Curated annotation (Swiss-Prot):
Example GO BP: cell division
Places the protein is found: Cytoplasm
Highest rank taxon of the organism: Bacteria
Catalytic activity: phosphoenolpyruvate + UDP-N-acetyl-alpha-D-glucosamine = UDP-N-acetyl-3-O-(1-carboxyvinyl)-alpha-D-glucosamine + phosphate
Protein name: UDP-N-acetylglucosamine 1-carboxyvinyltransferase
Top-tier EC class: transferase
A GO molecular function held by the record: UDP-N-acetylglucosamine 1-carboxyvinyltransferase activity
Location of 2-(S-cysteinyl)pyruvic acid O-phosphothioketal modifications: 115
Length: 418
């Protein structure tokens, strides 16, 4: 098992180059199953989750070559079953089911794993596939789906906004007969990116980025070349890291348009923000942040994936604040670890009451999920003393070379084997 050892009290200053989006790469990689032709995917982040996705594609029978780009040819897929040993660590594997079903008429996926953040059921994914004509069976820990002939169009009204289910239904509907309508669809940039990828292969999709998406099914998709959008959560994480360290940072190869609410909250905290077409500059030199009120909600609201990082900001800010988590009911696993570091916070229902302190202190902490890991690492960078962060598996799932990027802006961080 690996751990980070971080010597804190460092001002983080410099340049960071942002990787491709984890949350767009995964559905796009699995959507390559829909095509029989070679596809080149650019800007795929080198992280554990994309490694697992590529491993699963190869298991199914796809040819995958890895260089600066990922080259995938799913023509010869002959296995439609994703076993437990391949998908148990990655919840995103459910996104393979829709493409398998749409192209081959069948598919089965072991109920997936990943971060244990509350109750993340796949019910909405399966509801959508049933509406498209699939028969669904749950047996021995597996989701099994089949359809006679092709999937057919449907009007699908989501009773809850779901990024994952929107992606599943949209991908499957690209090869369905007729026009499928998804109402109350999620609007996240990663959904837009996945739709743009599918459109580049010949899919007919309209309304993406709104709450109603229209998909006119086609018989087949072609090959192509596509570049993944930048990771907005990685960008936000480094911006917060600089802000809490009273530093100055420029993030390159990013997209400011996907971070409007995050940049607004950083500005409220006292940061000076400048933006360009593909860069963001934050200046918090020698300024202590002000506490900001946070309430997570679906895009374009404040992203739940930035909640833990802003918790750290509020814990070292002037004043007190409330963070309300509206997406996941158990996304507070960072709180007990931050309290070990001297943070003052109380959880009541879905709220975190944060009380700013002058200084966090080094401690031995455990990264219990991906964004907890990120929050503890950036907290360690500013804490007085030595912080050790255990269970790096989670951070490696979602952040590409995070320790090297932090070192480049002044962090004293080492990866050690226990």
């Amino acid at each position: 098992m690996n751990q980070f050892v971080i010597k804190g009290s460092n001002k983080l200053t410099g340049d960071v180059f942002i990787s491709g989006s984890k949350n767009a790469s995964l559905p796009i990689l699995f959507a390559t199953i829909l095509s029989e032709e070679e596809i080149e995917i650019q800007n795929v982040p080198k992280i554990k989750d994309t490694d697992f996705a590529i491993k699963l594609l190869r298991y199914l029978g796809a040819t995958v070559e890895e260089n600066k780009s990922i080259y995938i040819n799913a023509k010869n897929i002959s296995i439609y079953h994703a076993p437990c040993n391949l998908v148990k660590t990655m919840r995103a594997s459910i996104w393979a089911l829709g493409p398998l079903l749409a192209r081959f008429g069948e598919g089965s996926i072991s109920l997936p794993g990943g971060c244990e953040i509350g109750n993340r059921p796949v019910d909405l994914h399966l509801y959508g596939l049933k509406k498209l004509g699939a028969k669904i069976y749950l047996k021995d820990g597996y989701v099994k789906a089949n359809v006679k002939g092709r999937l057919h169009s449907a009007r699908i009204v989501m009773n809850k906004i779901s990024v994952g289910a929107t992606l599943t239904i949209m991908s499957a509907a690209t090869l369905a007969i007729g026009i499928t309508i998804i109402e109350n669809a999620a609007r996240e940039p990663e959904i837009i990116d996945t739709a743009n990828f599918l459109i580049s292969l010949g899919a007919k999709i309209n309304g993406v980025g709104t709450n109603t998406i229209f998909i006119k099914g086609v018989k087949k998709l072609k090959g192509g070349v596509y570049k993944i959008l930048p990771d907005r959560i990685e960008t936000g994480t480094f911006l917060v890291a600089a802000a809490i360290s009273r530093g100055k940072i420029t993030c390159y190869d990013t997209n400011p348009n996907t971070l409007n609410i995050v940049l607004k909250k950083l500005h409220e905290s006292g940061a000076r923000i400048e933006i360009g077409k593909d860069w963001i500059k934050l200046d918090m030199i020698d300024k202590r942040p002000k506490a900001v009120k946070i309430e997570t909600s679906p895009y374009p609201g404040f992203p739940t994936d930035m909640q833990a990082q802003f918790t750290v900001l509020n814990l070292i800010s002037y004043g007190s604040s409330i963070i309300t988590e509206n997406i996941f009911e158990n996304r507070f696993m960072h709180i007990s670890e931050l309290i070990k570091m001297g943070g003052r916070a109380i959880i009541k229902n879905n709220n975190i009451f944060c009380y700013g302190v002058n200084q966090l202190f080094g401690a031995q902490v455990i990264a219990k999920d991906l964004r907890t890991a990120a929050s503890l690492i950036i907290a360690g960078c500013i804490a007085d003393g030595i912080t050790t962060v255990d269970c790096l598996y989670h951070i490696d799932r979602g952040y590409c070379q995070i320790e090297n990027k932090l070192k480049n802006i002044g962090a004293n961080i080492k990866r050690l084997k226990k």
